[in-house]
Design a protein with these regions (language model features):
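N-terminal beta1-alpha1-beta2 module of alpha/beta enzyme domains
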Residues: 1-71
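Flexible, glycine-rich active-site loops centered on histidine and acidic residues
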Residues: 8-21, 81-117
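Glycine-rich, histidine-containing beta strand-loop boundary motifs that form or position
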Residues: 47, 72-74, 103-107
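Glycine-rich "substrate-gating" loop/helix at the edge of Rossmann-like oxidoreductase active sites
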Residues: 75-79
Length: 117
């Protein structure tokens, strides 16, 4: 981890942790710690049903890191906007204002599986 109050060396650069399918999502915590250690400014976490829940992973990453920004990508059409806003608000409070949200369109197969229009 960076020294408290230290600025990330590559503040404008980030990395996508846990790409694709994962067997053990806890690996993302180690990836975020390493990203912060080498001076990256942000990590990105995507949503993938039954494999990756960005809010849960972001909470774990926030606890394990000190300075790095944590961004979660959520499917815009798969949960009520107030639920996503509530998650983001809580993550901002719990992470020391290091959390950001990005919205993505859901894959049609996921939408069908979840019964979404």
């Amino acid at each position: 981890m960076n020294e408290p109050g230290a600025k990330a060396l590559f503040d404008k650069f980030g990395t996508y942790i846990l790409p694709g399918r994962v067997d053990d999502p806890r690996r993302g915590i180690d990836e975020a710690i390493e990203a912060e250690r080498i001076g990256l400014g942000a990590v990105w976490i995507s949503e993938r049903f039954a494999l990756k829940e960005p809010a849960v992973l972001a909470g774990a990453v926030a606890e394990a890191t000190d300075e790095i920004r944590i961004n979660g990508t959520f499917y815009a059409t798969m949960r009520h906007p107030l639920v996503t806003a509530s998650i983001a608000n809580m993550m901002q409070a719990m992470s020391g204002n290091r959390f950001g949200v990005m919205f993505a369109r859901a894959v049609p197969a996921y939408m069908k599986m979840m019964g979404a229009p």
